[in-house]
Amino acid sequence: MYFTLGTIFNMESGDLLERVIAGLRELPINLVVTVGQDIDPLELGPQPIHVHIERFIPQSSVLPHCDLVVSHGGSGSVIGALAHGLPSVLIPMGADQPLNAERCVELGVAKVLDPIRATPEDVRAAASTVLEDPGYRRSAARIRDEIAALPGTGHAVALLERLAGEKRPIRRPL
């Protein structure tokens, strides 16, 4: 399982980081946590052997080995999870996160918790539910397949080159 509140703008979460770790570390899973450059993992105290807290690990290194992502619901975290067919527990705090979380619930790929009210028990229960209910995994796999079927970056580059070559402004019809 991978847990992150993002590695850049994650200092405004109060004790949410501690509450989530407290809930997840009681599950019989390996837990990888990233906290960003401004938080020293040692500040979070000793952890059980199955909990690994780092400042930063590339998502691309962690996600292929996960069954669930617990995150703030930022676009990078959500797209990363979905591209790997992983369901999520989302704890949105602001910006794009609440809208991302709402859409993930609509798609059946996530449960959402309130960042102010969520207790360690709530986090543990939500993670257990998503892990145990195969519907979340099936929905995430469906989205993964849709993402994989999209044209790649080569297609986007070709379109941009063509647009740049036309040397005309893009105008929308009135």
Each language-model region and where it sits:
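Short hydrophobic alpha-helical runs that function as membrane-insertion/retention elements
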Residues: N30-V33, V89-L90, K111-L113
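A donor-sugar binding/catalytic signature common to diverse glycosyltransferases
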Residues: R55-R103
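Short, contiguous acidic/charged loop-to-helix segments that flank catalytic cores in large enzymes
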Residues: I8-E12, I53, I91-A95, D114-I116
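Donor-nucleotide binding loops and adjacent catalytic segments primarily
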Residues: M1-L68
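Residues at alpha-helix caps and immediate loop-helix transition turns in enzyme cores, especially N-
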Residues: S13-L16, N100, G152
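C-terminal amphipathic helix plus adjacent low-complexity
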Residues: P120-L174
